Amino acid sequence: MTRNSLLNPEAENADPDQALRPRSLDEFIGQQAARENIRVFIEAAKKRQESLDHVLFFGPPGLGKTTLAQIIAREMGVGFRATSGPVIVKSGDLAALLTNLEDGDVLFIDEIHRLQPVVEEVLYPAMEDRALDLMIGEGPSARSVRIDLPHFTLVGATTRQGLLSTPLRDRFGIPVRLQFYSIEELRQVITRAARLLGMEIAPEGAEEIAKRSRGTPRIAGRLLRRVRDFADVAGSKIVDRFIADEALNRLEVDKLGLDLMDRRYLMMIADIYKGGPVGLDTLAAGLSEPRDTVEEVIEPYLIQLGLVARTARGRQLNGLAWRHLGLTDPREAEGKHSEIKNQPGLL
């Protein structure tokens, strides 16, 4: 079973949200602590007439890492170059990127945890010394050449900070964790997006979409566009709670923002493994999904909601998950039975 594409927090190849992206820190909604810290670092760098220190954004997908990287370049008044870890296969690929940067430019590397080790080795002196060490030739005649680079800011983004090597992670002077959004923050994101899309949305309609957006602005934007489709076909000039609820139910997105894959994940633990604990590899095999998909896409929001707990022995359902599924936790039933047995005269 494939995940509902509406609830996939990964970016689409042709990103329809591009026109909705905020273009400044003032327009950016949410991530208040991170946003205000970035504002301070930018102002300080501009006062000293220096390039901003290297920045690492980490956290679940869809929370604004790419957008913030673009905003940094815009606020600093410099150029912006973007690439991703899997694209940079050889050290020469990275060297070509670095040598084409202008002074002060921002180089954004998405999925930076997927850089090849040989590429990382080239990146270390570039980040620390603004220099590129290259080997020219082969064999006994090979020699090392150092090329000076312009001042630049590397902005890395990752959903798996733990997979970054320690030497690379330590070279980022500004590590920034991005958190899931609150319902109120998502309501503001949706209201702003609706205005830019030229559609009218009632506060309660925006809130209904926000509640089912998994704490992720990217998902909120997708759901908003699909709800707009239902509203247009129904002839409704305004998206209210009824229209939003009807559309999202038909899209099989429930009140907590869970889709069929999420519910299948929870039901597998509840039904087959009696609430757990159960190992990640076992779950991935049962769902016919890669381990990384389960760990990076399905689980973070379920854990954030308190539906699932990661324990040393595996994944385990919490009480909220049983209630959401409309089932009784067998461990609670066993506990009550034990209490009755221990009371004289009752059994």
UniProtKB/Swiss-Prot annotation:
EC number: 3.6.4.-
Classification via SMART domains: AAA
Compartments where located: Cytoplasm
Lineage per the UniProt record: Bacteria, Pseudomonadati, Pseudomonadota, Alphaproteobacteria, Sphingomonadales
Residue numbers spanned by region Large ATPase domain (RuvB-L): 1-181
Protein name in UniProt: Holliday junction branch migration complex subunit RuvB
Record's subunit section: Homohexamer. Forms an RuvA(8)-RuvB(12)-Holliday junction (HJ) complex. HJ DNA is sandwiched between 2 RuvA tetramers; dsDNA enters through RuvA and exits via RuvB. An RuvB hexamer assembles on each DNA strand where it exits the tetramer. Each RuvB hexamer is contacted by two RuvA subunits (via domain III) on 2 adjacent RuvB subunits; this complex drives branch migration. In the full resolvosome a probable DNA-RuvA(4)-RuvB(12)-RuvC(2) complex forms which resolves the HJ.
One GO term of the biological process aspect: DNA recombination
Small ATPAse domain (RuvB-S): region residues: 182-252
Protein task: The RuvA-RuvB-RuvC complex processes Holliday junction (HJ) DNA during genetic recombination and DNA repair, while the RuvA-RuvB complex plays an important role in the rescue of blocked DNA replication forks via replication fork reversal (RFR). RuvA specifically binds to HJ cruciform DNA, conferring on it an open structure. The RuvB hexamer acts as an ATP-dependent pump, pulling dsDNA into and through the RuvAB complex. RuvB forms 2 homohexamers on either side of HJ DNA bound by 1 or 2 RuvA tetramers; 4 subunits per hexamer contact DNA at a time.
Domain of life per record: Bacteria
Family recorded in the similarity comment: Belongs to the RuvB family.
Sites where the protein binds Mg(2+): T66
InterPro entries given in the database record: AAA+_ATPase, AAA_lid_4, DNA_helicase_Holl-junc_RuvB, P-loop_NTPase, RuvB-like_N, RuvB_C, WH-like_DNA-bd_sf, WH_DNA-bd_sf
GO-annotated cellular components: cytoplasm; Holliday junction resolvase complex
Transmembrane segment boundaries: none
Encoding gene, per UniProt annotation: ruvB
Organism of this sequence: Zymomonas mobilis subsp. mobilis (strain ATCC 31821 / ZM4 / CP4)
Positions of DNA binding: R291, R310, R315
Catalytic activity: ATP + H2O = ADP + phosphate + H(+)
